[in-house]
């Protein structure tokens, strides 16, 4: 179920402070965040965030198409090793 409109998008407070500081400094450095649940806002466009996936920080360059989505959508937590090879085909 989607979040109700009257509540507005959820964003952790520290994330807004970090984004404002990055904009003020003018340097294009990666902003490390753990908040995968936060919504991407229009003011984050152009910034690069390092979104933690439980193992490492994956760099996410925010574009206009990402606005309204969550940071966690762009940092997968599971790796798919592929299906097992067919042992009968290898043997003969």
Swiss-Prot record:
Domain of life: Bacteria
Keyword RNA-binding recorded: yes
Keyword entries, A-Z: Ribonucleoprotein, Ribosomal protein, RNA-binding, rRNA-binding
Gene3D superfamilies associated with the record: 30s Ribosomal Protein S19, Chain A
GO cellular component, one term: cytoplasm
Keyword Ribonucleoprotein in annotation: yes
Pfam families named among the record's database cross-references: Ribosomal_S19
GO MF annotations, alphabetized: rRNA binding; structural constituent of ribosome
UniProt GO BP: ribosomal small subunit assembly; translation
Cystine pairs: none
Function: Protein S19 forms a complex with S13 that binds strongly to the 16S ribosomal RNA.
HAMAP family with a match to the protein in the record: Ribosomal_uS19
Family named by the database record: Belongs to the universal ribosomal protein uS19 family.
Name this protein carries in UniProt: Small ribosomal subunit protein uS19
Gene: rpsS
């Amino acid at each position: 179920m989607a979040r109700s409109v009257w509540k507005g998008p959820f964003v952790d407070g520290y994330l807004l402070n970090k984004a404002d500081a990055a904009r003020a400094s003018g340097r294009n450095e990666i902003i490390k965040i753990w908040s995968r649940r936060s919504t991407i806002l229009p003011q984050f466009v152009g910034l690069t965030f390092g979104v933690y996936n439980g193992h490492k920080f994956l760099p996410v360059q925010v574009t206009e198409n990402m606005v309204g989505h969550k940071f966690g959508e762009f940092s997968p937590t599971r790796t798919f090793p592929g299906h097992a090879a067919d042992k009968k085909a290898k043997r003969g």
